[in-house]
Amino acid sequence: MHAIAENHGVKASYTKEELQACGQGRLFGEGAAKLPVDQMLMVDRVSQISAEGGAYGHGIVRAQLDINPDLWFFKCHFVGDPVMPGCLGLDAMWQLVGFFLAWKGHKGLGRALGVGEVKFTGQVLPSAKSVEYVLDIKRVIARKLIMALADGTVYVDGKAIYTAKDLRVGLFDPAAMSGAEIK
């Protein structure tokens, strides 16, 4: 069930089209974790992914989201005071930790398992040009449970605005996901 794909880690960057393909199960093969698609995919491209480097020497992911005033969340959060919901930036970091596991070749259904600490010190407004996510992989556990831990930072136009410590994402056997409870 948690077999490693033979073609894992063959690329160091990914386009929006490739990320959408990941969400449809066409990028890393059958059984690989999927990204959300369409509006819930909070990433336009992965500019760097590596199993080496980063603050802990276990890997790094850099990805970007292009910002424009027409993005869906600016229309409803909040009327007259548009701002990207902070939870979407947090979700983007979880998406990228799961993507890292799939890129490494691990299989299973991806689920966010939590975060140790999150700090918001800024915001993403419609006038911004770009958001960058930087994830430093702390550890990958590959036993019965496949799990990655990472620290992440969200930048808007080059300025750090969110930090997250101990982001956790796990990959699960589909049979263990039959109800509301994760087994």
Swiss-Prot record:
Pfam families, A to Z: FabA
EC number(s) given by UniProt: 4.2.1.59, 5.3.3.14
Pathway participation: Lipid metabolism; fatty acid biosynthesis
One CC-aspect GO term: cytoplasm
Catalyzed chemical reaction(s): a (3R)-hydroxyacyl-[ACP] = a (2E)-enoyl-[ACP] + H2O; (3R)-hydroxydecanoyl-[ACP] = (2E)-decenoyl-[ACP] + H2O; (2E)-decenoyl-[ACP] = (3Z)-decenoyl-[ACP]
Keyword Cell membrane carried by entry: no
Protein name: 3-hydroxydecanoyl-[acyl-carrier-protein] dehydratase
PANTHER family: 3-HYDROXYACYL-[ACYL-CARRIER-PROTEIN] DEHYDRATASE, 3-HYDROXYDECANOYL-[ACYL-CARRIER-PROTEIN] DEHYDRATASE
Record-level GO BP terms: unsaturated fatty acid biosynthetic process
Oligomeric form and interacting partners: Homodimer.
Keyword Lipid biosynthesis (UniProt): yes
Listed SUPFAM superfamilies: Thioesterase/thiol ester dehydrase-isomerase (SSF54637)
Active site: 77
Family: Belongs to the thioester dehydratase family. FabA subfamily.
Keywords assigned by UniProt, alphabetized: Cytoplasm, Fatty acid biosynthesis, Fatty acid metabolism, Isomerase, Lipid biosynthesis, Lipid metabolism, Lyase
Natural source organism: Hahella chejuensis (strain KCTC 2396)
Coarse class of the protein's main subcellular location: cytoplasm
Molecular function GO labels: (3R)-hydroxyacyl-[acyl-carrier-protein] dehydratase activity; trans-2-decenoyl-acyl-carrier-protein isomerase activity
Annotated function: Necessary for the introduction of cis unsaturation into fatty acids. Catalyzes the dehydration of (3R)-3-hydroxydecanoyl-ACP to E-(2)-decenoyl-ACP and then its isomerization to Z-(3)-decenoyl-ACP. Can catalyze the dehydratase reaction for beta-hydroxyacyl-ACPs with saturated chain lengths up to 16:0, being most active on intermediate chain length.
Location relative to the cell: Cytoplasm
Taxonomic lineage: Bacteria, Pseudomonadati, Pseudomonadota, Gammaproteobacteria, Oceanospirillales
InterPro entries hit by this protein: FabA (IPR010083), FabA_FabZ (IPR013114), HotDog_dom_sf (IPR029069)
